[in-house]
C-alpha cells in the first residue's frame, strides 16, 4: 500500500472528513515520526510495533558497475519491530 492508497482508503472510510484534511493528517503524522527518529528517539505504537534506529558498522562494499571496493561509513538506519498483535494478524498467511 502506498501513501496515496492509504489516504484514499481513510478518506473513503471517513466520508464526513474532506480528503485534503485526511491527506494533511497522514503527511503530518509521517513527518512527526520522521522528526522523532531523526532526533534519535524511539516510537512505540502499542499493538502495532516500534520504530527505532539501528547502527550499521562501517564496511567495505563494492560498486555494482565496476566491482571496485568502496569504503562505506557507519550510519544509523530506521528499523521497525512489529508488535505481537500485528505479528499474529499477519501470520494468517504463514
Curated annotation (Swiss-Prot):
Taxonomy, superkingdom: Bacteria
Quaternary structure note: Heterodimer of an alpha and a beta chain.
Summary of the function given for this chain in its UniProt record: This protein is one of the two subunits of integration host factor, a specific DNA-binding protein that functions in genetic recombination as well as in transcriptional and translational control.
Keywords carried by this UniProt record: DNA recombination, DNA-binding, Transcription, Transcription regulation, Translation regulation
HAMAP family registered for this protein in UniProt: IHF_beta
Protein family: Belongs to the bacterial histone-like protein family.
Pfam families found in the cross-reference section: Bac_DNA_binding (PF00216)
GO cellular component: chromosome; cytosol
GO biological process, one term: DNA recombination
SUPFAM superfamilies listed in its UniProt record: IHF-like DNA-binding proteins
Gene Ontology terms, MF aspect: DNA binding; structural constituent of chromatin
Transmembrane as UniProt keyword: no
InterPro entries: Hist_DNA-bd (IPR000119), Histone-like_DNA-bd_CS (IPR020816), IHF-like_DNA-bd_dom_sf (IPR010992), IHF_beta (IPR005685)
The keyword DNA-binding is assigned to this record: yes
Identification of the protein by name: Integration host factor subunit beta
UniProt-listed SMART domains: BHL (SM00411)
Amino acid at each position: 500500500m502506498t501513501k496515496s492508497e492509504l489516504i484514499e482508503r481513510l478518506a473513503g472510510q471517513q466520508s464526513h472528513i474532506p480528503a485534503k484534511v485526511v491527506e494533511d493528517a497522514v503527511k503530518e503524522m509521517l513527518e512527526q515520526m520522521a522528526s522523532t527518529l531523526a532526533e534519535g528517539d524511539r516510537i512505540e505504537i502499542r499493538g502495532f510495533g516500534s520504530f527505532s534506529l539501528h547502527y550499521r558498522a562501517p564496511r567495505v562494499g563494492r560498486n555494482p558497475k565496476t566491482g571496485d571496493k568502496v569504503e562505506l561509513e557507519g550510519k544509523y538506519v530506521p528499523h521497525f519491530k512489529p508488535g505481537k498483535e500485528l505479528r499474529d494478524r499477519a501470520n494468517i498467511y504463514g
